[in-house]
Amino acid sequence: TVIDVKCTSPKQCLPPCAKQ
């Protein structure tokens, strides 16, 4: 699972952001 680099904050790069 690659982390979405589009997330501005690392805390936002969580499951909720992964759904985006």
Swiss-Prot record:
Subcellular location: Secreted
GO MF terms held by the record: potassium channel regulator activity; toxin activity
InterPro entries: Scorpion_toxin-like_sf
GO-annotated cellular components: extracellular region
SUPFAM superfamilies the UniProt entry points to: Scorpion toxin-like (SSF57095)
Entry keyword set: Ion channel impairing toxin, Neurotoxin, Potassium channel impairing toxin, Secreted, Toxin, Voltage-gated potassium channel impairing toxin
Tissue: Expressed by the venom gland.
Family listed: Belongs to the short scorpion toxin superfamily. Potassium channel inhibitor family. Alpha-KTx 02 subfamily.
Domain notes: Has the structural arrangement of an alpha-helix connected to antiparallel beta-sheets by disulfide bonds (CS-alpha/beta).
Function: Potent selective inhibitor of Kv1/KCNA voltage-gated potassium channels.
Stated name of the protein: Hongotoxin-5
Source organism per UniProt: Centruroides limbatus (Bark scorpion)
